[in-house]
């Protein structure tokens, strides 16, 4: 939506159009989220690196890091691919990016069903399906409709995947989810 608005009214106009939505979301979250209890017990300060002693953490963080590297690498080249290979104009580009976003919203809504049924299989299948999607894009890059469908599938998977990784952190480190989350963010940003 932001890309489409940016094409039609400029990037400043796009930001201004989204301000009321952001304010509405802020107010809705303020009203609807429950207050969190404050843990007044002093927890000992420990190094986040101690989490690497938990056997599943190094492997999981490596898989998480590889997933995000692949996702960001592909996303970096989406626009140039669409403009040069698929020959998509500015309006089509905005619509395809909107389709990626809508598909991502849908994926985020439904990924919990798959995570609850087959957690690790879902975490494994998402990057495999994304890699297959990227490979197929190379084969059908000349067809705008095929590219739009494949990128929508990619958006569905790519946006749902972080939900799985945050769930993994909470399950792998139930007593240290905050520290594990910080470590995961550091791995992703590396």
Residue ranges of model-derived segments:
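Pair of pore-lining "gating" transmembrane helices in MFS-fold secondary transporters
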Residues: 53-73, 148, 152-156
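A late C-terminal transmembrane helix in Major Facilitator Superfamily
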Residues: 171-190
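Helix-loop-helix hairpin linking two adjacent transmembrane segments in secondary transporters
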Residues: 1-34, 77, 81
């Amino acid at each position: 939506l932001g890309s489409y608005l940016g094409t039609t009214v400029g990037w400043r106009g796009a930001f201004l159009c989204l301000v009321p939505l952001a304010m509405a979301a802020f107010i809705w979250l303020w009203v609807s989220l429950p207050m969190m209890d404050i843990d007044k017990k002093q927890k000992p300060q420990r190094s986040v690196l101690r989490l690497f002693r938990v056997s599943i953490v190094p492997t999981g963080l490596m898989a998480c890091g590889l997933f995000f590297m692949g996702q960001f690498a592909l996303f970096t080249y989406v626009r140039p691919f669409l403009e040069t290979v698929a020959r998509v104009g500015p309006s089509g580009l905005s619509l395809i990016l909107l389709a990626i976003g809508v598909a991502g919203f849908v994926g985020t809504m439904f990924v919990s069903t798959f995570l609850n049924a087959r957690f690790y299989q879902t975490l494994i299948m998402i990057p495999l399906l994304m890699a297959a999607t990227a490979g197929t894009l190379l084969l059908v890059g000349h067809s705008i409709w095929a590219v739009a469908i494949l990128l929508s599938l990619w958006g569905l998977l790519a946006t749902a995947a972080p939900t799985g990784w945050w769930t993994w952190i909470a399950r792998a480190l139930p007593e240290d989810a905050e520290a594990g989350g910080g470590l995961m963010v550091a791995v992703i940003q590396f």
